[in-house]
């Protein structure tokens, strides 16, 4: 049987992997977006774990809200990424440090 400790451990491992992805790869926007999505997934795992342990459905409702916000964030991020690639021909974060008026 899966206990609360197992689920919290899984959430912590996912969070650490996403944090490492953000700090180790700061050049590729796609990897940064994927790392942020993985971080939100680890938070969702923790919400589900505590919701299951306490017998309360509020954690599951928060998960649906977070998934909705994450989907909107991913769509906006990818739209910005496509626009960035069309104008600059790169998705490297280091080359996109200047604003154009």
UniProtKB/Swiss-Prot annotation:
Cited Gene3D superfamilies: 1.10.287.3510
Keyword terms, alphabetized: Cell inner membrane, Cell membrane, Membrane, NAD, Quinone, Translocase, Transmembrane, Transmembrane helix, Transport, Ubiquinone
Major location (coarse): membrane
GO biological process, one term: ATP synthesis coupled electron transport
Pfam family, one: Oxidored_q2
Entry GO CC: NADH dehydrogenase complex; plasma membrane
EC number(s) given by UniProt: 7.1.1.-
Localization per Swiss-Prot or TrEMBL: Cell inner membrane
Subunit comment: NDH-1 is composed of 14 different subunits. Subunits NuoA, H, J, K, L, M, N constitute the membrane sector of the complex.
Family: Belongs to the complex I subunit 4L family.
Protein name: NADH-quinone oxidoreductase subunit K
